[in-house]
Amino acid sequence: MNLAQLIVVGNVSTDPGTRQLPDGRYRTRFRVAATSRTLDASSGRWRDGETTFLAVVAWRGLAELAARLRTGDRVIVVGHLRQYDYARDGGREIGYEVQAQEIAVGLASRRTATRSSHGAAAGTESRA
């Protein structure tokens, strides 16, 4: 197993596809779009850079939770990069995917209900 661990922060770019394998395990696969950002010193504004699309695979219980994600959800994925070979147009290709160990939904860009320290709902907040 390749132990190149990485953290990917981005948006889910395809709805997850989940399937149960013959041995009973669940596997969920989806893609994440991660866009770099740089601060333009002259204008003081953030500018989007290149977008990288990565396949993410989750297994077992994490796969069942990842199946609830939807296109556009902001996620933070921690996992290992895995290289694999596959056949395409009569030849062999190399692909890469992130084998997820943890997946978190980024709440800063999502409408969420928050709770005060007393447990009462404090309202909703939306950030972009």
Identify the function of each model-found stretch.
Residues M1-A128:
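Single-stranded nucleic acid-binding surfaces, predominantly the OB-fold ssDNA-binding core
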